[in-house]
């Protein structure tokens, strides 16, 4: 397992590492499990640079669905890798039709990347070669006869995603409550049920109890958090820079149990203050 990063570049980097360590050229079914907004599409782009997703959070990219057009493919130049978002495609096709298309692609020696794999598994009858769950943590498994089953990953990643969303929103609220100079000086890190703000060179002049009080006041105001573009969110209507704009709670009031460590910790290895 890995802590699921929240910034886009961090997820891309982790995707590349996962591909190098766990992906095999013999894998035909690669299943992803996780709620919308958990970062599955970004992780897939990191694992498979240059892949054209049939759809993502921005809309539909490829139509008709290439997986369902296999019978019309002729000659040498046919796709080797297909992408399939089960939750999205069930709005247009029956699950049984999609399962038949996946089985045909496997027989033809193709590779299929399937989002929301847990929805098609009961009809497919076979598990994925590589099964990845995305929640607060990224869980990577290579199932065998004894499991794990997709539902086991669902039980882990679906409940845990809420902590990741809360941590990311709280992280951005801290930045929002800082001065511009302090915000530009810090970088982000990931820990379980929380976040890390790191400062290089010298300890910042930040009154931590005051910063915590400011953030708790923003939480009490229950400000809406909305997607603006791929690099910004709207925090109570104010534009704020963010590299993971879809990985947030809907409003600040949904952040529960926020608090900050009341002192800085010096990391002697990286020479940073946290």
Q: Residue locations for each model-derived region?
A:
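Active-/binding-site microenvironments in catalytic and ligand-binding cores
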Residues: 148-274
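Well-ordered, non-membrane alpha-helical segments in soluble/globular domains
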Residues: 11-17, 93-100, 208-213
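N-terminal pre-Walker A segment at the start of P-loop NTPase domains
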Residues: 1-25
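Conserved nucleotide-sensing/catalytic segment adjacent to the nucleotide-binding pocket
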Residues: 55-118
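Short glycine-rich, basic-tinged beta-strand/loop micro-motifs
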Residues: 29-31, 77-87, 192-199
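Glycine-rich phosphate-binding P-loop
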Residues: 28-52
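Conserved mixed alpha/beta catalytic, RNA-binding, or beta-rich assembly cores of soluble enzyme
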Residues: 30, 47-50, 68-69, 92-95, ...
């Amino acid at each position: 397992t890995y802590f699921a990063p929240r910034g886009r570049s961090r997820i891309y980097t982790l995707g590349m590492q996962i591909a190098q360590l766990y992906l095999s050229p013999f894998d035909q079914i690669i299943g992803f499990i996780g709620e919308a907004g958990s970062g599955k599409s970004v992780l897939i782009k990191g694992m498979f640079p240059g892949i054209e997703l049939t759809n993502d959070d921005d809309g539909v990219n490829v139509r008709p669905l290439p997986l369902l057009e296999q019978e019309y493919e002729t000659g040498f130049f046919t796709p080797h890798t297909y992408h399939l978002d089960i939750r999205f495609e069930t709005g247009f096709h029956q699950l049984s039709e999609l399962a038949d298309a996946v089985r045909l692609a496997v027989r033809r020696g193709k590779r299929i990347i399937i989002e929301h794999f847990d929805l098609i598994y009961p009809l497919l009858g076979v598990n994925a070669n590589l099964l990845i769950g995305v929640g607060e943590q990224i869980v990577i498994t290579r199932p065998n006869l004894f499991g794990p089953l997709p539902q086991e990953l669902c039980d882990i990643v679906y409940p845990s995603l809420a902590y990741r969303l809360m941590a990311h929103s709280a992280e951005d609220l801290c930045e929002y409550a800082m001065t511009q100079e302090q915000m530009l000086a810090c970088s982000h890190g990931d820990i379980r049920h929380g976040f890390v703000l790191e400062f290089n060179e010298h300890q910042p002049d930040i009154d931590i109890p005051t910063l915590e009080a400011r953030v708790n006041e923003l939480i009490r105001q229950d400000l809406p958090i909305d997607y603006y573009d791929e690099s910004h969110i709207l925090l109570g209507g104010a534009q704020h820079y963010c590299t993971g704009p879809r990985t947030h709670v809907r409003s600040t009031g949904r952040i529960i149990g926020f608090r900050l460590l009341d002192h800085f910790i010096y990391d002697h290895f990286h020479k940073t203050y946290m």
